[in-house]
């Protein structure tokens, strides 16, 4: 990282400048996570029920985007939600679900094994054409994650 910073500085640029160049070349990806803790005696069961609900009835859309793929690492199974086609996942077994939308957004759910807590990981992306649009695109991606949280009703206690 230090070598990269020094190299960019020698060209009169910053690491931020380089990051923007990479976003323009490969796409602007933004990630975030939330953690939900359920209280009381039934907290762990509520989380298990939430996962089972997502597993048995995956969302058709999330924040207006069609959900194309469900990856179920517990069952080690991938499923195309449009065609019903399935395939085996060759990854370690874990109680994780991942939804992938038509525009490449990814939402992953992973419950804790030891406490009544579940984490949701969000990855969203967009095209970035130039540095001038960075701030507006960044805000749009943040709003997109907030829209996903609202649509999946994850902002409720």
Q: Where on the chain are the PLM-derived regions?
A:
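General beta-strand recognition
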Residues: 108, 117-119
């Amino acid at each position: 990282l230090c070598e990269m910073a020094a190299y960019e500085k020698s060209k009169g640029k910053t690491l931020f400048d380089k990051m923007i160049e990479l976003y323009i070349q490969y796409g602007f990806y933004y990630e975030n996570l939330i953690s939900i803790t359920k209280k009381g005696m039934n907290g762990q069961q509520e989380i298990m029920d939430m996962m089972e609900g997502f597993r048995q009835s995956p969302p058709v859309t999330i924040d207006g985007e069609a959900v194309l793929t469900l990856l179920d690492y517990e069952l080690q199974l991938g499923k195309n939600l449009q065609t019903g086609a399935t395939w085996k996942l060759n990854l370690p077994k874990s109680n994780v679900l991942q939804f992938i939308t038509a525009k490449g957004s990814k939402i992953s759910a992973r419950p804790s094994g030891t406490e009544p807590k579940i984490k949701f990981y969000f990855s969203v992306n967009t095209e970035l054409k130039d540095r001038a649009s960075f701030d507006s695109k960044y805000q749009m991606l943040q709003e997109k994650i907030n829209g996903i949280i609202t649509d999946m009703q994850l902002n409720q206690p």
